[in-house]
Amino acid sequence: MNNNTRTLQCRVISNKMQKSAVVAFERFVKHSIYGKFIRRTTKLHIHDENNECNVGDIVSIRECRPISKTKAWTFVGVIKKALT
């Protein structure tokens, strides 16, 4: 695999699809006028071949080639399991 692919740590918010999941990660953006840092959430669709992740898990994902119209990230592994 290419060494300059992006990897992220995200929280799983939905896994109701087959071989897919929706994850969300937060980033902080500085307001252009007031200078306050604002929390922004980004949702991504990921490819989970074996349906390993569950809602609430912290997972590692990697950018890849486009798999479908909305999926361009793939599941790497579970970092922390959900408490349920």
UniProtKB/Swiss-Prot annotation:
Provide the Gene Ontology terms for cellular component. Answer: cytosolic small ribosomal subunit
Q: Does the keyword Protein biosynthesis apply?
A: no
Q: Which domain of life is it from?
A: Bacteria
Q: Is Ribosomal protein one of the keywords?
A: yes
Looking up InterPro entries in the UniProt record yields: NA-bd_OB-fold, Ribosomal_uS17, Ribosomal_uS17_bact/chlr, Ribosomal_uS17_CS
Alphabetized, the UniProt keywords read: Ribonucleoprotein, Ribosomal protein, RNA-binding, rRNA-binding
Cite the CDD domains for this sequence. Answer: Ribosomal_uS17
| Gene Ontology biological process terms from the UniProt entry | translation
Task: Check the record and name the HAMAP family matching this protein.
Answer: Ribosomal_uS17_B (MF_01345_B)
Q: Name the family.
A: Belongs to the universal ribosomal protein uS17 family.
Quaternary structure, from the entry: Part of the 30S ribosomal subunit.
Q: What does this protein do?
A: One of the primary rRNA binding proteins, it binds specifically to the 5'-end of 16S ribosomal RNA.
- This chain's protein is named Small ribosomal subunit protein uS17
Gene name of the encoded protein:
rpsQ
